[in-house]
C-alpha cells in the first residue's frame, strides 16, 4: 500500500520557494509546485506571502512573463532557514546515530551480528556507518515493501542473516509488519525514532521462516 507523502512544513516551503527563485528568476509556479510536491495554489499563496514580507520582488520580462528576485531581506531569510534546516538535519543524525548504536549493541549481545537493513535513505546510511563500531555485518540494504512477498524478493541474494532492522523513513509500520510476517517478531527491529507502534499478538507471531 502506498502511503501519502509527508507534507513539508511552512519553513520548508518558504525555503524551497526562495531557493527556486534564487536559482532561476524566471521559474514558473508550476515547476516550483512539482519540485516541492505541493499544490499549485499553495505555491501561489506562498509567493504572495513572500512578496508581502519583502522577501522577493517581481519584475516583468517579455513576453508577458514575470521574473522573481530575492531581496536582501529575502537572502537573509533564506540563510536563516537554511541554517535551521541543517541544524534539524544534524539533530536527526545525532538521534539516529545514538539509537542505531544502542540497537546494535543489544543485537550484538544477542548474537545477532549479520543484519539486513530494509529501507534505503539517510537512516540506512547512518546505520551502515554505525555498524562498523559494533562489529555488525550488514548483509545489504533492501528496498522497503509493505508485503512479505515483496520483501522476500527484495532480500534475494543477501544470503543468511540473523535479523532485519527497518530503516525506512516512509512506510515504516507497513514494512515492519511485513518483516515480522516473514521472520517473526524476535528477528525484526527498528530504531525508536521511527515510532513503529507495537503489533497485535496475531501479527507479531509471524511465519518465522
Where do the language-model regions lie?
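Short alpha-helical segments that sit at the start of domains
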Residues: 1-15
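N-terminal-biased segments
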Residues: 2-3, 56-58
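Short amphipathic alpha-helical interface segments
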Residues: 12-26
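Hydrophobic, well-ordered beta-alpha structural blocks that scaffold small-molecule cofactor pockets
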Residues: 22, 30, 35-55, 61-209
Amino acid at each position: 500500500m502506498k502511503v501519502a507523502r509527508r507534507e513539508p512544513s511552512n519553513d520548508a516551503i518558504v525555503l524551497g520557494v526562495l531557493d527556486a527563485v534564487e536559482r532561476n528568476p524566471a521559474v514558473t509556479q508550476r515547476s516550483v509546485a512539482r519540485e516541492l510536491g505541493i499544490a499549485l495554489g499553495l505555491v501561489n499563496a506562498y509567493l504572495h506571502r513572500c512578496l508581502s514580507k519583502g522577501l522577493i520582488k517581481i519584475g516583468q520580462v517579455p513576453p508577458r512573463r514575470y521574473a522573481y528576485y530575492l531581496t536582501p531581506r529575502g537572502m537573509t531569510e533564506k540563510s536563516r532557514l537554511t541554517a535551521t534546516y541543517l541544524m534539524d538535519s544534524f539533530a536527526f543524525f545525532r538521534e539516529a546515530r545514538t539509537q542505531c548504536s544502542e540497537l546494535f549493541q543489544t543485537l550484538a549481545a544477542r548474537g545477532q551480528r549479520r543484519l539486513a537493513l530494509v529501507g534505503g535513505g539517510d537512516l540506512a546510511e547512518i546505520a551502515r556507518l554505525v555498524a562498523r563500531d559494533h562489529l555488525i555485518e550488514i548483509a545489504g540494504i533492501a528496498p522497503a515493501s509493505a508485503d512479505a512477498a515483496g520483501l522476500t524478493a527484495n532480500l534475494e541474494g543477501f544470503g543468511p542473516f540473523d535479523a532485519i532492522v527497518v530503516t525506512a523513513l516512509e512506510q515504516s509500520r507497513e514494512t515492519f509488519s511485513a518483516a515480522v510476517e516473514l521472520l517473526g517478531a524476535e528477528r525484526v527491529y527498528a530504531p525508536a525514532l521511527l515510532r513503529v507502534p507495537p503489533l497485535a499478538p496475531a501479527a507479531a507471531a509471524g511465519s518465522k521462516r
